[in-house]
Amino acid sequence: MKAFLKKYSHAIAILYLPFYLFCFFGLEQRDTNYHIIESELDQYIPFCEWFVIPYFLWFAYVAATFAYFFFTNKRDFTRLCLFLFTGMTICLLVYYIWPNGQNLRPDLATLGRENIFTRMLAGLYTTDTSTNVCPSIHTFNSVGCCIAIFKSDALQNKKVIRIGALLLTISICLSTVCLKQHSIVDVFWGLVLSAVMYLPAYLPKLEQIPEQFRKANSTFY
């Protein structure tokens, strides 16, 4: 047991997840005035319920990426956590300081068609409010996982995995706007946040930061 705890002591990072969920769902329950996010471009993006598939695949994608690096490479896992958790915290702060939402969702009852995908989407619309949307965490986390995969030395020659991750990331980003879960504005700022977080997590000149972070918390390793 002691050897196991020493090997996987970086599991302490997982403690962030209950904190994040507590804060996120707390913000979801707020009764406040929301800034409506919209763009003229949103009107030109077609609604397509089929995109509910990559939208839900996001959960498996993030979990699988997280688990892979947790068990295979402590350094890559630390960099992924630095990227995701810092960015997600920034999103929470934005949602708290600048409450936002959108009114893009179609009325599924008058859509004129019903299928397994519209029923899945109806469930999503029921459980997930149209608030706290900008920046898009779906976009941000997908890009973060894709970057982690592309930056992994162990996956450099795994073309199928790399191309699959890229295509899935693009599909997830498209799903957020094609399902009218997000405005194109939310996706844009999710991408901007990804670019910002790339600097401390992966830029070569700053690459030592996660390693220094790990050493600073060496008591947990």
Over which residues does each language-model region extend?
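Interfacial helix-loop-helix junctions of multi-pass membrane proteins
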Residues: 109, 129-134, 171-198
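Aromatic-anchored segments of alpha-helical transmembrane domains
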Residues: 21-23, 88-97, 167-177
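Short hydrophobic alpha-helices at membrane interfaces in multi-pass membrane enzymes
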Residues: 157-170
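Hydrophobic, membrane-inserted alpha-helices
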Residues: 61-66, 142-148, 167-175
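N-terminal transmembrane-helix/juxtamembrane module of multi-pass inner/ER membrane proteins
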Residues: 1-63, 112-113, 121, 220-221
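C-terminal membrane module of polytopic membrane proteins
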Residues: 183, 189-221
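Membrane-interface loops
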Residues: 27-42, 70-160, 208-221
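Membrane-embedded alpha-helical segments of multi-pass membrane proteins
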Residues: 18, 54-61, 137-144, 188-192
